[in-house]
Amino acid sequence: MKIVLTADNHLNYYSQKFGAKLAERRGYFGRAWWETIEFAVKNKVDLYLCAGDLFDQVMPRNPPRAKVVEGFRKLKENGIRAFVIGGHHDTPATLSEGATPHNILAKAGLATVFEDVDRFSSEVLEIDGREVCISGMSTDRRLHPGMDPLEGLRIPAEGDFNIALLHYSIVKIVPCGEAEPCIRLSSIEENRDIDIFAMGHYHQRISKKVGSSLVLYPGSTEHNDFGEYKNKTGFWYLEVEGDEVRKEHISTSCQPMNRVYIHTSSLPRDQIMPKLIEEVKKASNPEGLLQLVLKGDLEFEHYSKIDFLKLAMVGNESNFYFEYEDRITPILEGFEHSSSGILEPREELVRLGEAFIEKSQGERDKEIWRRALELALSYYDKAAMEGRR
């Protein structure tokens, strides 16, 4: 039995920061996902499993929907059975939001879609003379942080070989955020008749044995953000013979992505801008995405000479997309921050601003701090007024 397991394809990807380049960025997501279809057909697999977040949104545009229909039709024409669940991005939070975007696949008879979020659905197939049970449950976005989605549930295991599709983090296997529900390891252990847990949600590939069960996360097929720039994108290809599962992680083509960290201690004080521009150009790729992260302490007189506008211009000229993250702590000689008593935010803002103005050397620096204080107070007052409405 041959299987392709994919997840977190995030078709119809959306990020406001790409502006006019969003369509081109989306193209990378679409092409990476399409590689899973072509691989499945070329290798004549028996099963194509999508463990959630095929789409990036509950209501994707028509072009990616049409491409998905084309892909799953290609699978069906080649005798490949497809099974899909919804993930955090493409499962409606409530019934009022409508059906999942995968519903069209079920209606067209192109895939079995397990849409229920609070109970398992299953189907038993005969493959190579064995009964294979595929079960799945879409993500329940109503669950509170810390809740176990499998609590009180038994996963169907009605075959000689059993596979379960889920889209959650599993405690002690992948990081679990404080604001999300997580499957306890004991829930995996209690469902020991499941041979493969085909998982989505975590964007790194994972292969982990829990008792007799194999837990597999394929990771995403394209990088979503700079926090993932080191991840290997792709999907799992599995060959099952008897109780043996041979697995191979197949890489997908992704848009080049890089993140560069520069600490202020490495910056020559008389050549800060030339050094920053040199590092940006060295890390650039005309087709890629680059993030520059600046961190460390820096004397205010040197910090004020960093031309962030020029940095952005050089970065954007040299890359498909560029951004910087300013984590530098400006140090003003003779100023020491201290706090005591009950903090009054607006008063503290004024006190800090006036202190920086007083300690500034030269009228230019003083004017910069005056303007910064005015802007900060205007934003604060606006937010305070909106909060009272």
Task: Please give the residue ranges for each predicted region.
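Accessory, non-catalytic peripheral segments of nucleic-acid enzymes
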Residues: 242-389
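His/Asp/Glu-rich metal-coordinating catalytic cores
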Residues: 2, 47, 58-73, 77-226, ...
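Short, internal active-site loops enriched in acidic
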Residues: 55, 89-90, 296-300
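Acidic/glycine-enriched edge-of-secondary-structure segments
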Residues: 21-27, 56-57, 133-136, 254-271
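N-terminal active-site segment of His-dependent metallophosphoesterases
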Residues: 1-67, 71, 363-374, 385-389
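Glycine-rich phosphate-binding loop signature in dinucleotide/nucleotide-binding domains
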Residues: 40-44, 128, 156-158, 283-286
